[in-house]
Amino acid sequence: MTTYNVAISLGKNVSPLTRAQLATNYTAKASSNEGLASSQGNKEFDNPSLLISNVGKSYQLHETSLNVLNGINLEIKPGEFLSIVGASGCGKSTLLRLIAGLDTSYSGSIDYQGKPITGTDLSRGIVFQEHRLFPWLTVEENIALAFSATNIAKEERKLRVEKQISIVGLNGFEKAYPHQISGGMSQRVAIARALVLKPKLLLLDEPFGALDALTRLKLQQELQRLWEHEGLTTILVTHDVEEAVFLADRIVVMESHPGRIKRIVPVPLARPRDRSSALFQRIKADVMADFAMVEVE
């Protein structure tokens, strides 16, 4: 079971809201501030970039069928930032692997840009919790490794690697090896490696989970900047509710046994977001109430 060690302080002037009031406030806020949750470069929200229809996934455990996902239905618009939260074992990472095409054994359908996902594709990039850098390769070599299955010209590869190193703020560390840089910098290399192929969909599986709190906050801000800069459709799997509220346009709350969507919470907050604002804290408290960590009276 996942525990969220976060103190919730709504301030003296903020009265507690019921779930119904919270939902009403979210809807009203979204209506009066339409477009605030998207960046200036992400305005094409008409057609779905990703359509997940009645997806189910089971594993065979000895002679028993283990139902991991059941009845997953989700529509994600181009340029949207979606966060998925839920307790360990609810199938968050499994769902991300299906979207990435790393696992094609499931029921239902997953369509990306109007076509069924039948395997991995360079238009979909993924970043895992572990940076998975090769210790014998430098920063630039680790990023350039993404081109190994492409026929992109050598000069174009070099230009793209240089650009991504600059975008993630690693100038001066091109020749450094993984053991010579911090964990946060290593994760930036992993993100740059995912972005260097210019994907349209970025999948993030707990990318900051192993980092210290301060580095995590810094990289959350960095990820927000990259999302706005690149205009990517982004799906983030996380256990950190505050991280989800800080980054996402919508939060998918999942429950377990089998993994399914409990509800979807909109986050109608302008960017950059103020973590101390009353509405930010109310949304966070409401989502955390799903995990019995905070009571919303």
Task: Describe the role of every protein-language-model region.
Residues S65, T120, E140, S166, ...:
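Signature (C-motif/LSGGQ) region and adjacent switch/coupling loops
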Residues V85-A87:
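The feature captures the beta-strand-to-loop junction immediately N-terminal to the Walker
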Residues A100:
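Helix-to-loop junction immediately C-terminal to a conserved catalytic motif
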Residues G108-T120:
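Conserved ABC transporter NBD signature motif
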Residues V127, I191:
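Hydrophobic anchor residue at the start of the ABC signature
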Residues L137-A144:
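Short coil-to-helix segment of the ABC ATPase nucleotide-binding domain corresponding to the Q-loop/switch region
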Residues A144, A153-F173, R225:
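Conserved ABC ATPase "signature" region
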Residues A176-H179, L197:
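Conserved signature/switch motifs of ABC ATPase nucleotide-binding domains
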